[in-house]
């Protein structure tokens, strides 16, 4: 199989000292002069931009300029009007206190206090009606930038095919049905600009198209920290995902070194705007940003091939991906530093469309037939712009051409959205928020459009990216390449065998969670088992590993309810096997991701500030959750797809526990099914395969964003469907399996794994 490629296209476009005017201008527009008499703002100050062709009002922290933030000098020699959102003209600008928008609506619950507006530091609380579960933040605080902290509060009963997408504060939503193909539409109040997706469709698999919208005022900016976290979490996932598909084992983040073949598995195109509107200092700042980005990519140990070009009226190519040294990051950085702002002095317009057409040409192929493997190429375009252009036409049409070229969004069953990411950075007060939003990708739980105050903030974004100091192992990564064996596809899987004199041999499964520990079920062991009788094998290796000790959850007691007529009680059925010697990771031996760890935060593409609650909402939402377990059949490992009943089918799933052999005296399922269990099996919505006795201790896994995250440990089942090796024969509908929910035993995991550098939240 040809190696899949990742093309990362960096397009750094026109940012001026304050942007450009709100309407496209001709390249040779004559300068006019506007008087400064009467332009003052009450409570603040102003600064001139573009040589006096525009001005920006400045207010103290916690205040914003009313009714506009910027004004342009018109050809008549007068400043643009001070016009409110309601199209009214005011005589003098003033600084007003920043307030956060109020909820336009809130479904299936209530919020308090109710107020026409909310001042900085005000708090608002949300609560759901009976039968609904709260997702997001129950309490939110109005921040200094006019935005609410936390996540959108949503009350959901899990009844829809897709989860309730919610109503972000400040927006209005049209549509309350969440069936497959249903569409919801969002609107903003007059004067506010919608960022994200105005329309979202419920798709196959239960996810919404697009990204969550928000309503933005002109004075709102993203902080460098917010931008760095959101951008980096998505960018690194793209890079890591490309490595996994390429068939290479990255090893630890800071240690992995991948030497690519001559065709390259990653191409990064850096396209730098050198037009007249930028200015020398901003051009230099943009080069520093790109230098930091090159360094960041190099920190992953990959050796991509770079392309480098600048443009104004026309593009100028400086480094081609076919150059012999294009994968040498130091050499590319040297070429970047040699670029001069004067290179485009004679033709200094801003032709954004032509720059994107140059990118399109580099993505294209000669002839009618595409090259082999073209549809496995991933593309990321990063645009830094004010959203305006002064020649060439609308650049959004080229983004549409690129999507068509890459066959993205054409087939609803295979939209291929993962193969194109367009990030847009708006820089300065004169950013056209509508245009930059139109250029950016719209993806669920991701942010692709950002607005920063100035070049200093933009440089800070890339500095914070490069300043990430923690080195984390890449968990939950698999390599699905052609020559891979079962352990390439399940590199975490461990086999545990226990030999007992005069009692025979018992086998269980487990999951590698760190270099010293395997997570499994406690019932696989007996109190009198000797260390030398317990063996562990990993990575498909024939050599058994010696163990140091077995750590049981302190609340596990299989005989805990014998007096009540319950012969076996599996609550807290988890154990950690500590190995005597440190594991050496490789292509067939990697750890699985555990919830509420920093590695899983990155795997889920969440901000670095993500909470354990957000992990749970992503991995175990209130619905039927698609999951899998790995079963050993003969000498092969096979993935079995099941559904965790975590919505309206949960109660009926748990009730079937009373039909298990030995539980005849159990009157209520809650006697044996505690809140620590997850339930799979049955025939609704699909006929789930069941676990077998030898599968005990293995991981229950959620596969999300090309990563594998363990959410449970296989514990016990209602029916032994694998007796006499006749698997899945005449399986009754009440055949259920129960798994220990890892979210319920996190304190114990965190304590026992505290020295394993997993970064528990």
Curated annotation (Swiss-Prot):
Q: Which Gene3D superfamilies match?
A: 2.40.10.120, Complement Module, domain 1, von Willebrand factor, type A domain
Query: Site annotated as Cleavage: where?
Result: 256-257
Name the residues annotated as catalytic in the UniProt entry: 523, 573, 696
The record's top EC class is hydrolase
Give every Peptidase S1 domain span. 474-754
Q: Which UniProt keywords apply?
A: Cleavage on pair of basic residues, Complement alternate pathway, Disulfide bond, Glycoprotein, Hydrolase, Immunity, Innate immunity, Magnesium, Metal-binding, Protease, Repeat, Secreted, Serine protease, Signal, Sushi, Zymogen
The EC number(s) attached to this protein equal 3.4.21.47
Quote the PROSITE patterns the UniProt record gives. Answer: SUSHI (PS50923), TRYPSIN_DOM (PS50240), TRYPSIN_HIS (PS00134), TRYPSIN_SER (PS00135), VWFA (PS50234)
Domain VWFA, residue spans: 267-466
GO CC aspect terms: extracellular region
Q: Which residues are glycosylated?
A: 119, 139, 282, 375
> What are the Sushi domain coordinates in residue numbering?
32-97, 98-157, 160-217
What modifications follow translation?
Cleaved by CFD following activation of the alternative complement system, generating Ba and Bb chains. Cleavage and activation takes place when CFB is already associated with complement C3b.
Recall the GO molecular function terms of this protein's record.
serine-type endopeptidase activity
Would you say which domain of life the source belongs to? Eukaryota
Where along the sequence do coiled-coil regions lie? Answer: none
- What S-S linkages are listed for this chain? 34-73, 59-95, 100-142, 128-155, 162-202, 188-215, 475-593, 508-524, 596-612, 653-679, 692-722
Function statement = Precursor of the catalytic component of the C3 and C5 convertase complexes of the alternative pathway of the complement system, a cascade of proteins that leads to phagocytosis and breakdown of pathogens and signaling that strengthens the adaptive immune system. The alternative complement pathway acts as an amplification loop that enhances other complement pathways (classical, lectin and GZMK) by promoting formation of additional C3 and C5 convertases. CFB is cleaved and activated by CFD to generate Ba and Bb chains; Bb chain constituting the catalytic component of the C3 and C5 convertases.
User: What does the sequence similarity comment in the record state about its family?
Assistant: Belongs to the peptidase S1 family.
Name of this protein:
Complement factor B
Q: From what organism does this protein derive?
A: Mus musculus (Mouse)
Gene name of this polypeptide: Cfb
